[in-house]
Regions:
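Terminal, low-structured helical/coil segments at or just beyond the last alpha-helical repeat
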Residues: 10-20, 144-186
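TPR alpha-solenoid repeat register
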Residues: 56, 91, 126, 159-163
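Residue-level recognition of tetratricopeptide repeat
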Residues: 28, 62-63, 97, 132, ...
Length: 186
């Protein structure tokens, strides 16, 4: 939910007022140029002034997941973002990626259902992550079904190639598993 509060930001020369959205965009800009500590500081300022600003929680989740590798804190921020702004599509795939990585079955199922019902979410990525989750669980049939669904949804050429490779990998694992299945006949 976008707020319209203002935050005081001091510079050496003058006091300048920024809206929370402007401060958020500054933080995202800092992060995109590799200035992680400055971006983190700005995001924490936003959260301290407006703890309900969902998109700052999303960016913090990404920082803690991909940069800091603090998965519990990342999960907290992704979950908070999802609760505060459930229609924000960008959050779902990153949160789901974390849950698949941590093998959290119940949350994977719950978040994937919400993601697939949220407009703007990359459904191919959601199905691909579900395929990966089931592949890690060695449930080849469910993995294949989800990778095939991902294939039907994908629009990016490189993502399509990745999904095709995942499907081939699962089929190979299925054949390999069948090769080691023994039948006892009497």
């Amino acid at each position: 939910m976008l707020g319209f509060s203002t935050i005081l930001y001091n510079t050496k020369f003058m006091d300048t007022y920024y809206t929370i959205e402007e401060k958020y965009l500054q933080a995202v800009d800092k992060l995109s140029y590799g200035k992680t500590t400055k971006g983190l500081k700005l995001l924490n300022e936003i959260i301290s002034n407006d703890p309900l600003y969902a998109r700052a929680h999303h960016q913090l989740g990404m920082l803690y997941y991909y940069e800091v590798k603090d998965y519990q804190t990342a999960g907290y921020h992704f979950k908070t973002c999802m609760e505060l702004e459930p229609s924000f599509p960008d959050n779902y795939t990153h949160y789901l990626d974390l849950l698949v990585f941590l093998n959290m079955e119940k949350l994977v199922n719950n978040v994937s259902v919400k993601a697939l019902n949220t407009p703007g979410v990359d459904t191919a990525e959601v199905y691909s992550l579900l395929g990966l989750f089931h592949e890690k669980s060695k449930d080849w049939t469910k993995a294949l079904i989800n990778y095939q669904k991902a294939f039907m949804e994908v629009t990016d050429h490189n993502d399509k190639i990745d999904i095709e490779q995942s499907i081939k990998r699962i089929r190979s694992k299925m054949k390999h598993t069948l090769a080691y299945t023994y039948q006892i006949t009497e």
